[in-house]
Curated annotation (Swiss-Prot):
Entry's Gene Ontology BP terms: heme O biosynthetic process
Protein name as annotated: Protoheme IX farnesyltransferase
Organism name: Klebsiella pneumoniae subsp. pneumoniae (strain ATCC 700721 / MGH 78578)
Function, as annotated: Converts heme B (protoheme IX) to heme O by substitution of the vinyl group on carbon 2 of heme B porphyrin ring with a hydroxyethyl farnesyl side group.
Family: Belongs to the UbiA prenyltransferase family. Protoheme IX farnesyltransferase subfamily.
Note: Carbon 2 of the heme B porphyrin ring is defined according to the Fischer nomenclature.
Lineage: Bacteria, Pseudomonadati, Pseudomonadota, Gammaproteobacteria, Enterobacterales
Recorded topology in the membrane: Multi-pass membrane protein
Catalyzed chemical reaction(s): heme b + (2E,6E)-farnesyl diphosphate + H2O = Fe(II)-heme o + diphosphate
Pathway(s) annotated for this protein in UniProt: Porphyrin-containing compound metabolism; heme O biosynthesis; heme O from protoheme: step 1/1
A single MF term (Gene Ontology): protoheme IX farnesyltransferase activity
Compartments, record wording: Cell inner membrane
TM annotation in the entry: 8-28, 35-55, 84-104, 107-127, 132-152, 162-182, 208-228, 233-253, 264-284
EC number: 2.5.1.141
GO CC aspect terms: plasma membrane
Amino acid sequence: MFKQYLQVTKPGIIFGNLISVIGGFLLASKGHIDYPLFVWTLLGVSLVVASGCVFNNYIDRDIDRKMERTKNRVLVKGLISPEASLVYATLLGIAGFMLLWFGANPLACWLGVMGFVVYVGVYSLYMKRHSVYGTLIGSLSGAAPPVIGYCAVTGDFDSGAAILLAIFSLWQMPHSYAIAIFRFKDYQAANIPVLPVVKGISVAKNHITLYIVAFAVATLMLSLGGYAGYKYLVVAAAVSVWWLGMALRGYKVADDKVWARKLFVFSIVAITALSVMMSVDFMVPDSHSLLAYVR
């Protein structure tokens, strides 16, 4: 039974989000790490993300039955009752928000609430099923964890937090569209209006390319704004150029699914590399940052 309750929280998604939380937290800490705050923030975000995933599993159990990738999920197979999952999700959420409020700060908690509401209330309940823009809305909730990590330290939503929000939101788009391409038949069978299904894969490729360009610009802003150093800048530029090259090669490939899967895998490599580099190559913003000259 423990295994089922763990699976329904989507541990892989929790782990991926924690990497970005750590990146945002350490970027803001700039070498002066408050370890109790670090632990409370990680635990709080983990529980909130877990809660959102359980609610998502509850909401999506009808369409999950139609998709090859999700047909064996815990709620689809009836290993946990829908009622029990709702109680479980609620308890996880309450615990997570309380940890963020009392262990971090109210701003971190409210950011968690906003990300949660967007993911569960706006994306899962409505946009995912009814709009081609569901991915765009969902990207905002996916970008919340690193911003929470950052604001847990600063207690302020400054330009650094805004840049993180932009980076991770823009990253979500090609990442998600790549999944929709190599899982095209699943989304089609479940009648989920993702861009590749509604507008076609060729249109999705155009969007992927444009979003990666925007992502590349956003990643550079951390260094230009004086928040991250030049080692981060080099890595950010390198992964962005490589990812963009992969996207452009998509116009000539014979097998879109193979290409999309490779693009998806590299997206994880890219965001992990950026999270690591912003953790270790931070700077204290000052008047010498390039952005200071245009303020």
